[in-house]
């Protein structure tokens, strides 16, 4: 019986590693970006999306798909796609993280492979988690979306810089109740302090949350308040504050207020802890209210080989 378990376990690890390798091979042809307006799912549903230290923190192969579109008919309004996959291998976490955003004529790319290590502190599920991602960053101007002088040499110069290697680093303390984390994204820009880099780029991210359990059985509710602090180049730093409500791990409700004077709301369902779907709506910032109608985001999470 022990022998069969080993075979099953080895087969599971092999399948998951093959899937991650396939995703890693494909991600270098995919487009993505670090963001001023992050996906709402990063706060609770998929924290690996923002912090590489969360890769492989939980059992199984976790696959997350996201799509976000601004609720507006304005030409060139932003749309975003994201996919992450992470897998736990003993104390090691492996993952791939791809984020794609197009706004107007600008398309940005960030595609990363992640290695994380989870150090147990005791038998009470307390861990110190460290993660690093490395991959490519690509930014291009789509000539078909340019309203202006197509021969402007600055456009060609911008496109000719091609893809650049970049990385993210994250750390987190996690337990059954308290989570504390910090992230330095876009390490290349952080180290080189490149003045030519455009605005709308993440500089840092930090967050703390605490889980509160109330009720038992069918009346059990887990409430997780969270505060986050983000730095974005060219903008004032942003505070996020809100909470997630988990009803018996079947129904989720969340809300976050952002100091940019916008708010995010989400609701979703979880089927047998293996398939979750959530929808999010984010109001526009104060600067855009009246000219746009906010954004809608749909997130799908599947947990395999658990």
Please give the residue ranges for each predicted region.
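Subset of outer-membrane beta-barrel
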Residues: 35-306
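Bacterial Sec-dependent N-terminal signal peptides
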Residues: 1-37, 243, 294, 304-306
